[in-house]
Each structure stands twice: as C-alpha cells, then as structure tokens.
A protein has these predicted regions:
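Ligand/cofactor-recognition surfaces for anionic moieties
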Residues: 2-77, 82-1020
Length: 1020
C-alpha cells in the first residue's frame, strides 16, 4: 500500500556527524518533528555550526514523526536517545506516537542536559526540562501561575495559543532582569519558542548555541574557565506573526491596504490584474514555510494564479488559528464588511482552527460563513514523500487522510488536491506542477461563479444510467429525479438563470430526453444533444492515448454511431440536462474498481470533454445518489493527474445532490469527484407491514384475546399454530408438538405471545417508502413516522428519555423488562408493547397535525402559524384519553420540544436554496451525514455533507446504544442456548454503518470484549 520508510541510518541529511572535532566540545542532539520544513533548517544550522564554530560541534539525528511507526526506526531512535545530550520535539499530536516517544525519552530525561518540547500532547510536554525549569508536573500543579493558565485557557478557548504567543514574546524581556536561576531557565524556555517560531537557519543556529551555552556541562565548565560565555549568541530574529506575503515583495505586510498599495505598483503584471474587479483568490499559508525558506510550492501557486489573470492575496499565520487571518485580511480595507476575495485556498493542509491538534470547527465555520466564499483545502504531503505517494494505489497515508482531508471537511473544505511533495533526503517541499495547475484552475472557476451574471452562466445537470441492473435512466437512491430536476429548473429560471423552452411537467421533460419513457440504458431512443467528431474529441482530451490503449481507437462502440461520439441529453437555454454514459463493464462491473488496466470508455470520456470544453459549463450538477465518475480508476484519496476522476471533472465546479443517509459514498464523491455535496432527505420510514397470509394470522391473534378464556380458546390456538406452520413461521417460533387441549392457559398464552411478538417484529421493521422530490413539503403521515422513530431513542447525552420509556414509567413498568418479557412471548406484555407503540405514534401525530396546512403537508409557513394560546398540548390529550394520564410532564416537555425542533429542521426547504448558493459561489455550511432518525442534527438537508470526525467516534450515544444492543443480544443467545452464553461472536464491520451510527458497531465490539472507549488528553 505504502512504500516502507527507509532506515534512519541511511538518511544522511538528518544524521550529521562532524568530520573533525579539533578539540571542540561535541553536543549530541536528537529531534522529532511533524513539519518537514524544520528538517532542512535544522540540517543547515548544524552544518553551519560544524563549519564555522571553533568551540562547538554537533552530531544530530533527526526524525519525522511518522517514521517512528517503523519498528526498525523506533529501535534506532531509542539508541540515539540513549547517547543524546539534547532532545527537541515539536507538534507531536498523534496519540500512539506521542506515547512511544514519551516511553523512549522518559527513562533518559534526568540524564539529558535539556529536553525542549514545543506544543505537543501532554505526555510529551512533560518531558520539558531546562535547568531548574521543568514541566514534569504539567496539568497537576497547584501553583498560582498554573491555575491562572488553566483559567485563561478555559476562558479564551482556541485563542489561547495566540495569548501564549504574546507571553512568549514579552516574558523574556521581564525575566532577563531577574537573577534567580529558575527565572533565567524559564526565560530560556520562552526564548526557545521565539527561536523555533522564527524558524530560519540563523534562528535555529542560535537556538542550538543557546542550549549548549546554558545546559551542556562541558561548555558551561569551559565558559567558567574563560570567565565569559564560550559561544557568541544572537537574540532571536522576529518576524510578523500574521500578515501578507508575496514572493516578489520586498517584505511582509501588516495590512491589506499596505499590501495592495505595493501590488498596484508592480510593472510585471497587466493593469487588468490591478483592477478591483479582477478575479481575486485568497491563499492561506503556514508561516513556518516562509521563515524557513521552504516556500517553493507557495511561490508556484502564486505564479500559476497570476498567470491565469487572478489577483492573489496570500496571508500567513504563525499559530494554528487561521480564522483571525481570514477576518483580518480578506476584507476590503475601506469597507470592512465586504470581502475582496472571490475564493479561498488553504495551502496548510489542516483544519482552519487548531491544525493537527485540537480543532475548533464552530469557530472556523463562523469565520467562513461570514466570509461566504468557496473554501478549498490543498494538501502538502507531510507524512509521506513524493515517491511514496506516487507509488501508492491508495494515495494518501491514512494519518494524512484523517488530519488533512477528514478534519478540513468538517470546516466545509472542498477539493482535496495534493499541492506539493517533499524530498526524502532534505525534507524540502517542491511544487507538483500539474496539481498546482489543477488547484489554480478550480479556484478561478469557483471565483467566476461569483462574478458571472446569472443569465450568462451555463449549467449542466447530469443524470445517471447506472448498471449492472440496467435500470431505467434517471434513477437515484430515494429520489424522484425528473420531478426534482423540473423543480430545480423552475427555481433557477425564477432566480434569473436563462432557462428556456422548459416543458410544463416533469413527465414531458422525461419524454423529451428519453423519447421513450421506458427506454433502457443504451437505447437508441435517447435524445442526441451533440455529435462529437473523433478529431474534436482527441483535440480536447489530452489523455486520449490512455483510453485508446484499453478500448482501441475512437469512437468505439459505446455512445457512438460508428463515426461520431454521441452526447445524450437536452438543452434548455443555458441549462443542459445530460445522461452520464454507462461505465462500459456491464458484464463485469467490479473490474472497473479492481483492475489496474481498466479505464472509462471513449463515450464516457467524451461526455465530460463536452461539458468542459464544448458546452463550456460553468458548473455541473450530478443529480442524486449516485453516478460512476467518482468511482473511475485512480488513487483513493489525493489523486494524481493520471487518475481518471481528476481528468474527467477537470476544473468544473461539481455540485452533487446526495442522500443524507449515505455519507460514506458521498465522501467518495467529495474526495475523488471534488464534489460540493448538497444533501437531500430520504423518504419517511414506514413500517414494513404484513403480507396477506401474515395479516390473516394477525387477525386470528386479535380474535384470540376475546376467545382465550372460553371453550373456543383451544380451537383458535390450534388454528393459529396450523397457520404458523403454513406460512413457515415455525422456523422462527418454536411450536409445541401437543394439541392445544393438552396445554394450560398459561402455555397457550405463551405460544400465542411468541407468535404475536414475531409478527410485531416483522410488521414494525422500518423501510423508506416512496421517492423524495427536491423542494416539495412533506406529508403529515411522513413527518409523523419520522418523528415517532426519532422519539423511540433514548438520548442520554441530552438527558432525554425515549417516548416509550416515559410511557412505561407512567404505568410502573420498565421498558427494558417489557422488551425482555415480550421477547419471551408473554402475551400480555406483547400486547402492552404494541399498545404503547400505537399510542406513541398517535401522540406524535397530534403534534404534526397541529402544524399542518390545509393540503395535509407541513411547511415552514404552517409550522410558524401554530399557536397554543394556553391550550393543553394535543399530545397530552392523547395520553390522557388512551390510558396514560400520568406521563411525567417534566420528561415529556423536553422531548416534545426536541421533536418540534426536529420538525422545523425537516420542513426547512434548504435543498433548493443550498444549490442556488453553491451556483452563486457562496460558502455552503457543512453538516454531518447519517441516519436522520439516530442523529437529527444531520437536518436540515441542503448542506455540504461530510462523514464524521475521526477524533469523535464512537460517540457517547453510540456507546450507550451499543451496550443496549449487546446486552439484548447476549440475553437472547443465553435464552436460546439453555442458559449458556456464547463463547465466540463474529461481527461484520461496515464503514457505511459506522459512519451512519457514529461508531455504534465499533462500540459493540468494544463492549463485547469488556472495554470502554476513553478520550485522550486533548478530548479526542
């Protein structure tokens, strides 16, 4: 999967041994860092000292944190630590590696002359020691200073780091005049921060000299003999912590006004680029790359954007909170509430606030929502070299996917495209020119969506004809595609887009595109929108030779008339509705996913060539879950220019309607199709119901209630058992061999109870019913089913009981015991549970009906028009009238307030609004995907759906739900096995299910083996 890391001993650039000491003191140094840019600065500083300093020589061994996963490298690291004088570490936030580092260094801490650790996990920070200064008791100190710092952190939250930077900058000036050793050691620790954050070769060189002068015993002894300092040390060279930068500028700038004033004096660019109306792209950069001189990839990005005619405003920040830079520099200096950038690209590769440490996504979202611009996150390779990435079928290292792809997605980040690689020997970054070009082109395309008038924008809607079952064209999971497209087209027309000749109905539109509503995939009856000659196709498809190698010469036999490539679809003014071709391997669809030689066919490629280069779309809308473009061969994440999804989509902004309950495959569209997801709600769940034979059985059981005590009780019991055998339900319910006349009333009740319970289980299975239409308000019964399902879950994280539990409590029963007795087939309890469920649905229905309009639908307007006017809530009346008058109102009130909140989220029509915002080049709010029943926070739909926070699963709710499931499973297994618990249990783990349930399956496994997940020191 990934190229193995070479042994550290072979990496000569980071293992530097001075050739000749010539009487100099030797200091042995070991460092571990996250950021490879420090590798080149450290190596240059050590080489400079070894060459120029007559009193000190340094032997250094350097490590990038991910290299310590290799057992061989870790053993070499421990050997180096055992011989070291000084240990330095920075940004060690990967929990398992932080533990390994702490375990390796801690036994040698007292012997080491100094340990200097910059922001990292607490167990690594505790290694800090410089003379009398120590962090050994970090987090445990009761000193006034420690308590002050804790309170400061709690109060300021994510801005704590910025406060700390101010302390680092000012405290050394104060401590300088305090004579005590402890004060001087504390001052040296603060100075170390300044040297390190300065990052230049000069600063790192003086940092190492300062450590040797003050903490290396042999240097200190020689200094005493000389009566003065042995080494000449300069104070840290300080740089702006936050500001603006340009590779051609003479300096860094503190304000946007100052930067623009310089920008407008340039003679190397045309006057058009100085015009405030020119497309403007904002770049976010890490200051460490600038001060260490490791900025080749930043220079390349600025140059590429400017070559495309864009103004570039590139800003940097020294901390981990880039929201301040966004708010400070991306607005007009003369009009502070007006953003001057049209799109933003982060080149840091990390979350906007918090970087690789603890993120603050709400703060990031607040800043980005205010800016309201598309936000792309490009990826510098941090955890792997260029060669490792190029050779990997997976693409990005899993840790890099988590930190640099998954976490920025929670901020609303788009287009995770690799920006730069790094040299395995020097650690220096280098731009990947074709990737830089792709990022720049996409940034400008997003910017142009903001700038172009609506009536001039050309849009493409792509519908699917998805094999292998050759289903009807225009299908998508849970979505009425043509009705939804018609609604979207009407909304676009009403908002000023040039949509002409739109059919009156969705059926008419479908007929125009298909000609025959029953047309199957590959049917010649599809409407031909364009015939593309082979010469035109080849001229506009740079990678056509790769397709010819697999499929032969164009045009091929798919989507072709033998001479031309055929583009199916229909044009409505500036809207093109096109049919995505099949992927070509209908007989063996898995070949496309697993064969390295597979590729899209000429017809498939021609469709996207048409959208990009001939139709000239400003954006494409993939309509529904899901198409096949994002599943084309290539790396899984962090694609190269040779990966087909990257080549197919090109620079087109890709907006994708996706079912909210499928974030796992939606994530594939985001990462491989560069999609901005607009989620749509799935149809309301309905009970599966019973087949005709099972319904007849249910009616017999209903009759049993009235006949059980009379003479016909035996007869109807026998009839029910015969019916159970007839419908093959006896395979699920164990029936006695004897006649009912030989059974007691209790035994008959138990048999009928077990059958009744099995029927309830079958009938109450929840299935989505119908198809969703984008922009159409839901029906009362649909909303009732959704809210009833939501109300059926305990939510301990919100201190909220389920509705069934509240109703059980009101009659003195425990819901868990009721489930158990119902599972055992105790007839009275099976009947009670059925009644509770029915009344719960009726109570929730009363809430929904009170907020419905005259058409039996629930809209934003009808919800707002509901007033109680001091009346008893209708759901309370349902409880009072149906045998549950004693429900605890303190429990019911928060639950129904929550259900009202969920109702508002369900009817919030943001699916059309979200699409129109995306087409305007606005920022689309991120939102988790998943099951709306388990997690109503995925609502309202119409947001940029992401998967999950890898640092947050399993959630506490998932752990609680998992425990309930495991307890019930084990109890049922015990009952079915004569009181014996199972010895082994097999569990199938699906990524999709874990994303939907926020890690419930993982939590089940943990529960079964008897462990409970605990957060790390950062709460992850």
């Amino acid at each position: 999967m990934f190229t193995s890391v070479p042994p550290i001993a072979t990496l000569s650039s980071r293992r530097i041994i001075p050739e000749n000491l010539q009487g100099r003191v030797l200091m042995k140094l070991v460092y571990v860092v996250l950021e490879p840019q420090y590798q080149s600065a450290m190596s240059a500083a050590v080489k400079s000292i070894n060459k120029n300093n007559s009193n000190l020589a340094i032997e250094v061994s350097g490590y990038l944190i991910e290299e310590l996963r290799s057992p061989e490298n870790y053993e070499v690291f421990k050997e180096d630590i055992a011989k070291a004088d000084i240990f330095i570490a920075s940004l060690i936030f990967i929990d398992d590696l932080a533990t390994k580092i702490a375990q390796a260094v801690a036994p040698h801490r007292d012997r080491l002359s100094a340990c200097v650790v910059f922001p990292s996990m607490p167990e690594v920070m505790r290694l800090n020691k410089m003379g009398s200064f120590s962090m050994e008791n970090l987090g445990q100190s009761k000193s006034a200073i420690a308590q002050f710092m804790r309170k400061r952190k709690e109060k300021s939250g994510s801005s704590f780091q910025d406060s700390m930077l101010k302390v680092v900058q000012t405290l050394p000036k104060i401590l300088k005049y305090m004579p005590m050793d402890r004060a001087q050691d504390a001052r040296n620790f603060m100075l170390s921060f300044q040297y390190w954050l300065g990052g230049s070769t000069e600063n790192i060189e003086n940092f190492l000299l300062m450590l040797a002068q003050n903490y290396l015993p042999t240097v200190k002894e020689k200094a005493k003999e000389n009566g003065s300092g042995l080494l000449q040390i300069k104070d840290p060279v300080t740089y702006l912590d936050m500001g603006l930068w340009h590779p051609l500028a003479p300096k860094m700038f503190e304000s946007t006004a100052e930067y623009l004033a310089w920008f407008n004096t340039r003679i190397d660019i045309p006057d058009d680029m100085k015009d405030p109306l020119a497309p403007c792209v904002g770049l976010l950069m890490a200051r460490t790359h600038l001060v260490t001189g490791d900025d080749a990839h930043y220079v390349a990005m600025v140059q590429e954007l400017e070559s495309l005619g864009a103004r570039v405003i590139s800003v940097f920040n020294g901390g981990l909170d880039f929201s301040k830079a966004v708010e400070e520099y991306f607005y007009d200096p003369k009009q502070k509430d007006r953003a001057i950038v049209d799109s933003v690209v982060s080149l840091t590769g990390f979350a906007l606030v918090g970087g690789p440490a603890k993120q603050d996504h709400p703060k990031a979202i607040e800043a980005l929502e205010k800016l309201n611009r598309p936000y792309m996150v490009a990826l510098p390779l941090v955890f792997q070299t260029t060669e490792e990435w190029q050779d990997s079928d997976l693409g990005l290292h899993p840790v890099q996917v988590a930190l640099q792809v998954a976490l920025p997605e929670l901020d609303g980040g788009l287009d995770p495209i690799v920006l730069s690689g790094r040299d395995s020997a020097t650690g220096r970054s280098h731009a990947l020119s074709d990737r830089v070009e792709t990022i720049a082109n996409r940034a400008i395309k997003w910017a142009n969506l903001r700038r172009k008038p609506r009536h001039e924008k050309k849009l493409a809607i792509t519908i699917f004809s998805f094999p292998p079952d050759k289903g009807n064209i225009g299908t998508a999971a849970y979505l009425d595609v043509f009705s939804s497209i018609h609604k979207v087209a009407e909304a676009l027309r009403d908002n000023g887009y040039d949509i002409t000749d739109l059919p009156k109905t969705s059926h008419d539109m479908m007929t125009e595109i298909l000609h025959d509503p029953e047309a199957m995939v590959g049917s010649p009856e599809l409407n031909i929108a364009y015939k593309m000659s082979v010469s035109e196709y080849e001229a506009n498809t740079p990678y056509v030779e790769d397709i010819i190698e697999q499929w032969g010469a164009a045009p091929g036999h798919l989507n072709s008339d033998g001479q031309n490539l055929l583009i199916y679809g229909k044009q409505y003014g500036n809207l093109f509705v096109g049919v995505q071709p099949t992927f070509g391997y209908e007989g063996d669809p898995m070949r496309l996913l697993f064969s390295k030689s597979a590729s899209p066919h000429h017809g498939f490629v021609a469709y996207y060539t048409y959208l990009n280069h001939i139709w000239g779309a400003d954006a494409v809308l993939h309509f529904g879950t899901h198409g096949s473009m994002e599943f084309m061969p290539g790396k899984q994440v962090g694609m190269s220019g040779d990966c087909y999804p990257d080549s197919l989509i090109g620079a087109l902004p890709n907006i994708y309607y996706y079912a909210v309950n499928n974030p796992s495959e939606g994530t594939i569209a985001k990462r491989r199709g560069y999609a901005t997801i607009i989620s749509y709600i799935t149809p309301a769940p309905e009970n599966a119901g019973l087949s005709r034979n099972l319904q007849e059985l249910s009616e017999l059981i209903a009759s049993y209630k009235d006949l059980r005590l009379g003479g016909r009780g035996v007869q109807i019991t026998n009839t029910i058992m015969d019916k159970v055998r007839l419908v093959n339900l006896d395979k699920d319910v164990e029936l006695p061999e004897q006649d009912a006349k030989d059974m007691s009333l209790e035994e008959r009740d138990n048999v009928i109870g077990q059958v009744y319970n099995k029927l309830m289980e079958i009938e109450s299975r929840v299935l989505p019913c119908g198809l969703h239409v984008v922009g159409e308000p839901p029906k009362v019964e649909d909303v009732t089913d959704v809210l009833t399902s939501i109300a059926s879950f305990d939510r301990p994280e919100d201190n909220m009981k389920s509705l069934l539990r509240i109703m059980c409590d009101s009659i003195g029963r425990d819901i868990e015991q009721l489930y158990k007795s119902s599972d055992k087939g105790i007839y009275a309890d099976v009947e009670l549970l059925a009644n509770i469920r029915a009344i719960a649905n009726k109570a929730v229905g009363a809430l929904v009906k009170a907020k419905a309009d005259d058409d039996g639908r629930v809209s934003k307007l009808s919800v707002l028009n509901f007033f109680r006017m001091g009346k008893t809530e209708p759901w309370i009346e349902v409880f009072q009238d149906n045998g549950y008058p004693n429900v605890n109102k303190d429990d019911i009130k928060p639950l129904f307030e929550f259900l009202e909140f969920c109702l508002k989220q369900i009817v919030a029509d943001n699916e059309l609004g979200g699409l129109i915002k995306a087409l305007e080049g606005d920022y689309i709010l991120p939102s988790p995907g998943g099951d709306p029943i388990r997690n109503p926070l995925v609502l309202p739909t119409g947001k940029n759906m992401h998967a999950l926070d890898p640092n947050s699963i399993p959630t506490s709710a998932a752990v609680q739900a998992a425990k309930t499931v495991v307890d019930r499973l084990l109890e049922r297994q015990r009952q079915d096995n004569n009181g014996v618990y199972p010895e082994t249990i097999a569990v199938v783990l699906w990524g999709t299910d874990n994303i939907k349930t926020y890690g419930e399956s993982l939590a089940q496994v943990l529960c079964m083996i008897g462990v409970k997940p605990m957060p790390d020191a950062l709460g992850r």
